[in-house]
């Protein structure tokens, strides 16, 4: 296998394009800023499904045609590139360049093994986009940091993270999954103490804006979760962390609804106060309290879809194994 460069670069930005996608101006602007800081120690690698024309850039940039999940592409990157740090960023992300530069400065100066921040929703003009915004606030501001503080977190934002190559080289799960964030997070949770979790919003993305789009997304996440769960089942520590993650992200609403039922049984006013408090906690900005209330009622539909997908995939996986 040919290594891209024998000399060690400081920083490699890796992104991923699907068919009919091209390298975005947003990422190019970020890359130019990083090139001005790191010079020839900076490079960009684009994993693409189809080659496309790239205008000449002052920084080194390379297209690699490679099919498969983002996780498989990351594993492939470890085998061909020797940069000291990898920044993985989705092609559709609008990066917050100023905060990313500050984030990387701290990451490298303090010799962190891995780091990430928050990803925001770039627009919310209809009710589904508002639901996703509230769900992201709940995930990034409450569930994820709480689980990491309890030493049971495994979720990192797959849209953007930075890791030190030498710490993870040949250490990550040798599997295939849609959920690269959880596959990497499992290893981080168990073995990596030196992690930089920034409270800054490092980028934004356009949310799914239709009901069916969210259904299909959650179905795909369910497939990714269950295949990952089956692949690590014999690892007790990984299994425990993954099950806790699944409960916290996809079944917390059951507890919320159960408590809501209890409070309404006691007193209608008490029940309404409870719903109002929960809506206020998960809404940001605070003028979205009404939509947070709607979120509590509607969004469990997508968690149920996720659960059905998980059960369906596990049953099919076990039947497949029995036939082998």
Identify what each model region corresponds to.
Residues 249-320:
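Membrane-embedded multi-pass helical conduit in multi-pass membrane proteins
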Residues 107, 114-140, 175-177, 182-242:
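Catalytic donor/gating beta->alpha subdomain of glycosyltransferases that bind UDP-sugars
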Residues 40-51:
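Short beta-strand/loop segment that forms part of the nucleotide-sugar
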Residues 83-94:
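Short beta-strand-to-loop acidic/aromatic patch adjacent to the donor-nucleotide binding site
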Residues 65-81:
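Glycine-rich, basic loop-to-helix element that forms the pyrophosphate-binding segment
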Residues 19-35:
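Short, well-formed alpha-helical segments that are part of the catalytic scaffolds
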Residues 9-14, 183:
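Cell-envelope/extracellular polymer assembly enzymes that use nucleotide-activated donors
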Residues 71-73, 97, 103-170, 175, ...:
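Long helical/loop segments within the catalytic core of UDP-sugar-dependent glycosyltransferases
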């Amino acid at each position: 296998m040919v290594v891209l460069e024998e000399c060690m670069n400081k920083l490699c930005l890796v992104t991923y394009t699907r068919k009919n996608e091209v390298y975005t101006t947003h990422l190019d602007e970020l890359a130019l800023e990083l090139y001005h800081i790191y010079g020839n120690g900076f490079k960009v690698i684009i994993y693409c499904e189809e080659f496309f024309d790239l205008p000449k850039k002052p920084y080194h940039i390379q297209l690699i045609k490679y099919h498969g999940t983002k996780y498989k592409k990351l594993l492939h990157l470890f085998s061909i590139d020797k940069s000291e740090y990898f920044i993985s960023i989705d092609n559709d992300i609008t990066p917050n360049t100023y905060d990313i530069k500050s984030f990387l400065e701290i990451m490298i100066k303090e010799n962190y093994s891995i780091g990430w921040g928050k990803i925001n929703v770039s627009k919310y003009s209809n009710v589904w986009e508002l639901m996703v915004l509230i769900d992201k606030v709940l995930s990034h501001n409450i569930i994820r940091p709480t689980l990491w503080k309890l030493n049971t977190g495994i979720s990192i934002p797959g849209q953007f993270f930075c890791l030190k190559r030498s710490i993870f080289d040949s250490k990550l799960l040798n599997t295939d999954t849609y959920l690269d964030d959880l596959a990497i997070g499992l290893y981080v949770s168990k073995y990596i103490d030196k992690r930089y979790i920034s409270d800054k919003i490092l980028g934004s993305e356009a949310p799914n804006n239709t009901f069916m789009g969210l259904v299909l997304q959650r179905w795909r996440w369910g497939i990714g979760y269950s295949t990952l769960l089956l692949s690590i089942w014999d690892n007790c520590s990984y299994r425990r962390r993954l099950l806790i993650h699944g409960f916290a992200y996809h079944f917390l609403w059951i507890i919320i609804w159960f408590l809501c039922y209890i409070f309404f049984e006691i007193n209608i006013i008490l029940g309404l106060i409870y719903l109002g408090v929960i809506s206020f906690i998960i809404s940001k900005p605070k003028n979205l309290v009404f939509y947070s209330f709607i979120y509590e009622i509607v969004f469990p539909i997508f968690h149920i879809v996720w659960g059905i997908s998980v059960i369906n995939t596990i049953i099919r996986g076990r039947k497949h194994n029995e036939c082998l």
